[in-house]
From Swiss-Prot:
Pfam families: GatB_N, GatB_Yqey. Its EC number is 6.3.5.-. This is Aspartyl/glutamyl-tRNA(Asn/Gln) amidotransferase subunit B. The gene is gatB. It catalyses: L-glutamyl-tRNA(Gln) + L-glutamine + ATP + H2O = L-glutaminyl-tRNA(Gln) + L-glutamate + ADP + phosphate + H(+); L-aspartyl-tRNA(Asn) + L-glutamine + ATP + H2O = L-asparaginyl-tRNA(Asn) + L-glutamate + ADP + phosphate + 2 H(+). The keyword Nucleotide-binding applies. Heterotrimer of A, B and C subunits. PANTHER family: GLUTAMYL-TRNA GLN AMIDOTRANSFERASE SUBUNIT B MITOCHONDRIAL AND PROKARYOTIC PET112-RELATED, GLUTAMYL-TRNA(GLN) AMIDOTRANSFERASE SUBUNIT B, MITOCHONDRIAL. Belongs to the GatB/GatE family. GatB subfamily.
């Protein structure tokens, strides 16, 4: 659909109520796969981290990964879910090249966790409670690479390659209940929800949750209901959403696309759709299947999972501080205003800020550098700020500023030098000769020259108009190439003005 066929977003919200639902797939950090002893790690040569179980070869039998079960229970508890005293695996039957067995071992009517909720903080600081229907265990599928098509898509591809290294990797799929009431903030809620899930699994230590690697993937369901109709619309499920920004953009696009179709008297097809980051659009995939289409039946080769009450309580006691509670604590400890803390949260750099403070930096200084200069450089280079420089490196720059070795202006140059791989903060200072001049001699020479060049300013200072000293201070800082402490320069300017 062309951009011109999209309805204006505000107009779409006036006419329709968006109804949301999310399925978030979290790859678990375990040594081996869900049902085999094949190693579980990202990368590796294609089709090397596999066993007969992963390929569904005759005679091979699955064995449940105990650590994956524990991780799944921990996640369920963190989501406020009830943990099932007995849950069962099921075969989800469908045919696709990345599924060697032609079925996926998942869970159907007896998931490991159910009926929970998660608090989501919106950009304006409001808390929205998102209902969780269930969290269930399953194995991942392989990965297809389409050759010859545009930007790796299947459309127009000459052929496809399949890598089964990912097949059998343990997953937890978190399924929300129907989410009403998001209104015009539906895209922002979608982004905030996925961000919250990412924060939770990282805090638990059960997943790297790197969306660019597929550790965490989101399928976003969206339908529109005409205002006042009281009826649910036909939903679409948008797949291939692999960044927080994409989640927000995909929801906004689908609302505009569906609204345009409905307003023109058309109907929405229940289907999966694929998000394309390069075009900012979704495209039709396949008709959306219902549960009956997958012909679920109990997995005959696996016994039910029946965790003891003692194990559940042991895992509950080991849960870390919830991310939402942690954020409130940090805000109070750091003394940030609501606006300052929200700025950090919205930047996605809270973890980096925490690590920088733990490395010895003052919270306000850490906030200023991460959300200011470092974010500016990251935006200019089109990369994630967290990939540019480490919290320890930032803390070392802040330490040099606090010690008086650097001014803020010089520190910006040092930050760029560290980012460009010129060495540690101190090494960049030494190599570039950026340290603040601590000897008053060169400062006095520059001040005297500036005063002589601006006799009118000198006269004003002598008459008690000390604010006029700013012109001299600026000239001195320029002459010293910023390598001077402005406060010390001001003191000396006032002294020399009266003495000359």
């Amino acid at each position: 659909m062309a951009k011109a066929e999209l309805m204006d977003y505000d107009e779409a919200i006036e006419m329709f109520e968006p109804v949301l639902g999310f399925e978030v797939h979290v790859e678990l950090n375990t040594r081996t796969k869900m049902f085999s002893d094949a190693p579980n790690f990202f990368g590796g040569e294609p089709n090397t981290n596999i066993t007969p179980v992963d390929l569904g070869l005759p005679g091979s039998l699955p064995v449940v990964n105990e650590q994956a079960v524990k991780h799944s229970i921990s996640l369920g508890l963190a989501l406020g879910c009830e943990i099932a005293p007995s849950s069962r695996f099921a075969r989800k039957n469908y045919f696709y090249p990345d599924l060697a067995k032609n079925y996926q071992i998942s869970q159907f009517d007896e998931p490991i966790a159910f009926r929970g909720s998660v608090e989501v903080e919106m950009p304006d600081g409001r808390i929205v409670t998102v209902p969780i229907e269930r969290a269930h265990m399953e194995e991942d599928a392989g990965k297809l690479t389409h050759v010859g098509g545009a930007t790796g898509r299947i459309q127009g591809a000459d052929h496809s390659l399949v890598d089964y290294n990912r097949a059998g990797v343990p997953l937890v799929e978190i399924v929300t209940d129907i989410i009403y009431g998001a209104e015009g903030e539906a895209p922002e809620l979608a982004k905030a929800y996925v961000s919250t899930i990412r924060d939770i699994v990282v805090a638990l230590g059960i997943s790297d949750a790197k969306m660019e690697r597929g550790n965490l993937r989101c399928d976003a369901n969206i339908s529109l209901s005409p205002r006042g109709s009281g009826k649910l619309g036909t939903r679409t499920e948008t797949k291939n959403v692999n960044s927080l920004r994409s989640v927000e953009r995909a929801i906004r696009y689908e609302i505009q696309r569906q609204a345009a179709i409905l307003a023109a008297g058309g109907t929405i097809t229940q289907e999966t759709r694929h998000w394309h980051e390069d075009t900012g659009r979704t495209s039709a995939g396949r008709p959306k299947s219902d549960a009956d289409d997958y012909r679920y039946f109990p997995e005959p080769d696996l016994l039910p999972v029946q965790p003891s009450a003692e194990l559940i309580e042991e895992l509950r006691a080991a849960l870390p501080e919830a991310p939402a509670i942690r954020r409130r604590r940090l805000k109070a400890e750091w003394g940030f205003t609501d606006l300052e803390f929200q700025d950090v949260v919205n930047s996605g750099l809270l973890t980096e800020l925490v690590d920088t403070v733990e490395a010895g930096a003052a919270p306000q200084a850490a906030r200023k550098w991460w959300t200011g200069e470092i974010a500016r450089i990251a935006n200019a280079r089109g990369v994630d700020a967290a990939t540019l420089i480490s919290p320890t490196q930032v803390a070392s720059v802040i330490e040099l500023v606090e010690a008086g070795t650097l001014t803020n202006r010089l520190a910006r140059d040092v930050i760029e030098g560290v980012i460009d791989g010129e060495g540690t903060a101190q090494e960049v200072v030494d190599a570039r000769g950026l340290a603040v001049v601590s000897d008053d001699g060169p400062l006095i020479e520059a001040i005297d020259a500036a005063l002589q060049a601006q006799p009118d300013v000198l006269a004003k200072i002598r008459d008690g108009k000390v604010q006029a000293a700013g012109a001299v201070i600026g000239a001195v800082m320029k002459a010293m190439r910023g390598q001077a402490d402005a406060a010390r320069v001001r003191e000396l300017v006032l002294e020399r003005a009266q003495a000359s």
